[in-house]
A protein has these predicted regions:
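Active-site-proximal specificity loops/subdomain of glycosyltransferases
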Residues: 1-19
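Short, surface-exposed loop and linker segments with low hydrophobicity and enrichment for Pro/Ser/Thr
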Residues: 1-7, 47, 159-161
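Short, hydrophobic/aromatic alpha-helical segments in well-folded domains
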Residues: 8-12, 25, 37-40, 121
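Extracellular/periplasmic catalytic domains that process cell-envelope and extracellular macromolecules
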Residues: 17-18, 45, 87, 159-160
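Short beta-strand-to-loop acidic/aromatic patch adjacent to the donor-nucleotide binding site
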Residues: 20-29
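Structural recognition of the beta-strand scaffold that forms the well-ordered cores
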Residues: 24, 50-53, 134
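Conserved catalytic core of nucleotide-sugar-dependent glycosyltransferases
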Residues: 31-126, 178
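C-terminal catalytic/acceptor-binding lobe
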Residues: 107-184
Length: 184
């Protein structure tokens, strides 16, 4: 089955392969206050190949056999055709360089497949020795969290600063996205 992610990767790596130096990929349940959040990250990390919530921690990497459940993750369900180590992270909001996109294109062309994107982006980044950053602004891109933004409590100054500079996942209520943007 071809996913929206597959189509987006094909578009930016093959159809318009040199139009952009970097591309942000963002799922619909990701919240950020405005485009300035992304612009600030672009300015802060202009040369990174991967910006995402992935720490490349050696304790969370799959270096053992493919059937390992390693840290309780889904490694047994993923078929990766390149040598280890394999990494994983939250890719719901990630910026990829054209260089990384071309490496993903190479993998897709060579093996006629891709794999689970939460492992694909960081594993390809590591395999090709590309640059990456796990900025504090993306530490709120998580699997399942409830953020202060979704609660009815009084905002504190620190919360306001985070709202203006961080990216949040998941925020499933898209009406809350609109409400937060309208109130700022």
């Amino acid at each position: 089955m071809i996913s929206g992610w597959d189509k987006a990767l094909l578009f930016f790596s093959t159809i318009v392969p040199s139009k952009y130096d970097h591309v942000w990929f963002i799922e619909d349940d990701v919240f950020f206050l405005n485009e300035q959040v992304l612009t600030n990250l672009d300015l802060k990390y202009p040369n990174q190949d991967l910006i995402a919530n992935c720490d490349f921690d050696k304790n969370n990497v799959n270096t053992t056999n493919v059937n390992s459940t390693n840290v309780g993750w889904v490694w047994p369900l993923i078929s990766i055709k390149i040598e280890k180590p394999w990494y994983a992270g939250m890719m719901c909001a990630a910026r990829l360089s054209n260089t990384l996109l071309q490496c993903i294109r190479w993998y897709a062309s060579k093996y006629n497949t891709l794999f689970f994107l939460e492992a694909l982006f960081p594993t390809i980044t590591s395999h090709f020795k590309l640059s990456y950053i796990n900025p504090i602004e993306l530490t709120t891109v998580t699997y399942r969290d409830v953020f202060f933004l979704e609660e009815e409590e009084e905002e504190e100054e620190e919360d306001q600063k985070r709202l203006e500079t961080y990216i949040f996942h998941p925020m499933k209520d898209l009406n809350k996205h609109l409400e937060l943007r309208a109130n700022k």
